[in-house]
Amino acid sequence: MSFPVPGPSSRESKSIRSGATLSQHPGKRSSRSTPHLRHEPDLATKLAFLKRPESYPGRVDRVESLETHMSWLFLAGSDVYKLKKPYRHERIDYATPAARRLNCLREVRLNRRLAPDDYLGTVRLTIDAEGRMALDGKGRTIDRLVHMRRLPEAFSLEQRLRAGTVTPMQIGRVVARLLPLFRDGPRARWSVRAYLRHLRTRITGTAAGLCRPGYGQARDQIEALAKALLDFLDAHADLLAARARERRIVEGHGDLRPEHVYLTAPPTIVDCIEFDRELRLRDPVDELAFLAMECDRLGHREVDAWLFAAYRARTADHPPRALIEFHKALNAFVRAKIALWHLDDPDTGPRRRWLARAGDYLARARGYIDGLRNRGHPHRNPASRRDSG
């Protein structure tokens, strides 16, 4: 069993050095510590150390480095080491060593729920009195990395979908893997009113983010999408309130995309959101709708039916189609905003790439909303504007 190696296409990744391609760093074995440093190492010095094969235990012939929006990954033999960027944006705070340490520990603990054998722990990046860096060496800790096994990318749901080899039985196993988390995970302590307020804030906050200056989005179109989602929320407050009243909102994964699901035996699911518990608090229907929406984006709309058939067959929960479509629309709306966040970072690739990605998500959100309208669902009911509970 190995840990995920996200490629540039699936994880918005690129080489740290080239900014475009996977970077491979062959090198001879030597000391596992750096040459003497007479000052506190800066980020570039840390990265240079982590790109060296001799920095890692065991025999590592080369290190492949990948940069994502919030971290660097160092692929060393059968292992992966993740260094979080000193990054702060809205709910995410990795700005200080203490914050990165806390989030590394959380990442390991939370992801062991669905990938218990693949999150090996955390590793300290240390520097000794002579200025030499090492992994778990003597001296002072200057940063922390997540240590993981490397999963074969060919096993990812994303790659299997692209190859056209995914079956309903495999999707059923993914649902079965998630069910203990949905059934036994900590419940949100939200009243009905708080849950409805959470959904409303998610919609309005996303709309505000999409309309930020510099993102180039048409405000009237964003506001129309937000209004349609709010109309559904108002018209179906009783349906959504019942989900909270039945205590279905659980601390789940929060980022259930095809590239985070591996069709191993049993399935392995990685990379949950660790930095904000509220973003992990989801209705299971919301989680599965997110995965279904991302599979739709890859051209595999059949996965939606497989996911919810497996879910209904294994639970006493039978969510109506309108609820599923609402969550697909809302998740696409949120993902459009996240795509546009990349425009704030010049190192994440061409601007047109992220504008196109956001446009695709917004088109999907409109499509799901149009589907709801065709079913006659999101008509505003003034009486339902009063949050229940």
Name each model-derived stretch.
Residues 2, 8-18, 23:
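Low-acidity, Ser/Thr- and Arg-rich intrinsically disordered low-complexity segments
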Residues 30, 46-245, 253, 258-334:
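Conserved ATP-binding subdomain of kinase catalytic cores across diverse folds
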Residues 32-41:
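N-terminal non-globular leader segments, chiefly Sec-dependent signal peptides
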Residues 337-381:
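ATP/Mg2+ or Mg2+-diphosphate-binding catalytic cores
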Residues 382-383, 388-389:
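Phosphate-binding active sites in nucleotide-utilizing proteins
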